[in-house]
Amino acid sequence: MAENAYSKAGVDVDAGYQVVERIKKHVARTERMGAMGALGSFGGMFDLSSLNLKEPVLVSGTDGVGTKLLLAIEADKHDTIGIDCVAMCVNDILAQGAEPLFFLDYIATGKTDPVKMEQIVKGVADGCEQAGAALIGGETAEMPDMYGADDYDLAGFTVGAVEKKKLITEGAVKAGDTLIGIPSSGIHSNGYSLVRKIFFKDNDFKLNEAFTELDVPLVEELLKPTRIYVKPVLEVLKAVDVHGITHVTGGGFVENLPRMLTNDLAVKVELGSWPVLPIFDLMKKYGQLSELEMYEIFNMGIGMVLAVAKEDVEKTLEVLVQNGEAAYVIGEVTTRSDDAVIFGGAKG
């Protein structure tokens, strides 16, 4: 009787049970040492003693995917958006030197579609596998009075750990350090309100628009999942003393690079030292944006930046290449006299 009354209120309990059954196989493949408990427990559990850290510091992060979700909904493609959610969280805690341990997701929707929910969680599990994190819990909330039937929101939460003496904070970066950039896959998960405005409001392009500059239709380019840098960067952290790490997200270079600096330091970024992806040139063209504006908003083809001592540059590049990464020397840290970010050859 209670179930029937709940159904009349617009909440499909049976669909929720179907989701749990469908996602079990995806959750199972994210298991790692330290993860405890089973799917359906009230709380997710992790055994920190499995890490063998002398002074463990826990580092947590939470994030969502923003309005990139609207493109996934419109294109009816939901199997990679979960990777974005994981990436936004784990890349952030990686910037402190932390290894992601576990992840939890939260999906809110107007109507529970078990197939769609499975696709979303599959993406989350894919991201967790890439990051080496266990998917130890989550929540799917059906709220018909809050969301349209096809709408959903996705958020994630991660916790990682690092040995206290290896925790990366802004005080470690020094003048003379070299900046090494690791490529992005594209826009990643920031700036999509502007992206959608440029392509679909200010210009009447279609989702499947073909641009000669792109090797895939527009929507495929825009939905390319955010790269997860955990495994290659953790290998670098084992090999050299990394002074600072920046995850280039919302606010682009201008807002994010200073986050690893003290107030007396600046970074000089040499434009042209890495290939800018074609999607950014298209947005600059059709959005009529200046070059500086682009670097204030987007990652411009670099998703993560490491600051290392000059004597560690060669080893850092070597480790990244050994782990399948392209990497570029993109600038240096200097003493600050004015702006925190200086662009060599920047155009207005």
UniProtKB/Swiss-Prot annotation:
Pathway: Purine metabolism; IMP biosynthesis via de novo pathway; 5-amino-1-(5-phospho-D-ribosyl)imidazole from N(2)-formyl-N(1)-(5-phospho-D-ribosyl)glycinamide: step 2/2. Pfam families: AIRS, AIRS_C. Its EC number is 6.3.3.1. It comes from the Bacteria. Keywords: ATP-binding, Cytoplasm, Ligase, Nucleotide-binding, Purine biosynthesis. The keyword rRNA-binding does not apply. InterPro entries: PurM-like_C_dom, PurM-like_C_sf, PurM-like_N, PurM-like_N_sf, PurM_cligase. It catalyses: 2-formamido-N(1)-(5-O-phospho-beta-D-ribosyl)acetamidine + ATP = 5-amino-1-(5-phospho-beta-D-ribosyl)imidazole + ADP + phosphate + H(+). Gene3D superfamilies: PurM-like C-terminal domain (3.90.650.10), PurM-like, N-terminal domain (3.30.1330.10). PANTHER family: TRIFUNCTIONAL PURINE BIOSYNTHETIC PROTEIN ADENOSINE-3, TRIFUNCTIONAL PURINE BIOSYNTHETIC PROTEIN ADENOSINE-3-RELATED. This is Phosphoribosylformylglycinamidine cyclo-ligase. The lineage of its organism: Bacteria, Bacillati, Bacillota, Bacilli, Bacillales.
